[in-house]
């Protein structure tokens, strides 16, 4: 006779994909199954649970999948998310995005479908929800927690800017890829004796530029937390090139970096469901300005640039070692909390130790680089000293 389930846990992934999501899904599923829990994977993030059709039996739902040790065993070897994802915000759904089955009930220009989300979770028999995502996904998890849904969150974003944790799934692979590609591009920059300008993702925080720069990926780096003077940058880049036997220099540019007195650069004016515009293009502008100004510091001779936007390359492919190990620990820690009956918590790393914090932390402040401690505002590069006693993830502690 089959054992009675201790309860049903649902897992979903929201926001951008990163390597490391699948190891977290796998770890939580296996731990849950081995302890008598039933696990449901909710496909396509908040969009999927929003589209549940309560007129159909659970086994016929397009956006649900029963997760077992058998069907998650191999997923940790792959990047992205096995459950797929979306950037949907259920509390702010445009009329044209309301599921067809709900058209009669929700026909305003902007609709809050939170009541439907809660009813759908109840329909599926979900007793615990594990959302894996960044501050947007987790802030909506907080909304559900306040409405009575038992939730335990797992932080994920290559930007590493979720408040309350030193580390978010996807960050290490992003840093690893950035360092690898920057070193590979050096062969081109050196062969042609050029400036190498590399733009990286990161939105409003500069961790994805600063940490690779600390590891030697570039001579200089530009971050959103501190405006830069293009004239000063040009002078430094020319000097770096002159001091390099191969006659080239490298700058990492966070997509949110800003010229002095200007605003962030957006690739277009469209916004996602959370109101975010798509950043991008600052690397192009820096490249152009460096070429214009370089002769002034190079005895009148021009210096050409190689301009490379990393974009999705740093969030694609298999996870690195850290993004295989930390997600495994996060998935297990989430299950620890569930088995202890705790809710409204986000698992985290604090000062190098696994821990958990209240969900509310996600919305209380913005996580940024501590410029005074870790950034040289005169030389546009990482600044650090006396690492004794600091956590493993230097510069990202929160």
Language model: regions and residue ranges:
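N-terminal phosphate-binding or glycine-rich loops at protein starts, especially the Walker A/P-loop
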Residues: 2-56
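A glycine- and small-aliphatic-rich helix-loop capping segment at beta-alpha/alpha-beta transitions
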Residues: 26-35, 55-66, 143-153, 169-173, ...
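Glycine-rich nucleotide/cofactor/substrate-binding loop typically near the N-terminus or early
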Residues: 32, 37-123
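Short, acidic/small-residue loops that bind anionic groups at enzyme active sites
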Residues: 36, 42-43, 145-168, 222-229
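Accessory alpha-helical/coil subdomains and C-terminal extensions
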Residues: 108-113, 119-122, 128-133, 141-143, ...
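Short beta-strand elements at the ligand-binding edges of bilobed clamshell
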Residues: 164-173, 318-321
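C-terminal non-catalytic interaction/assembly regions of soluble proteins
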Residues: 267-398
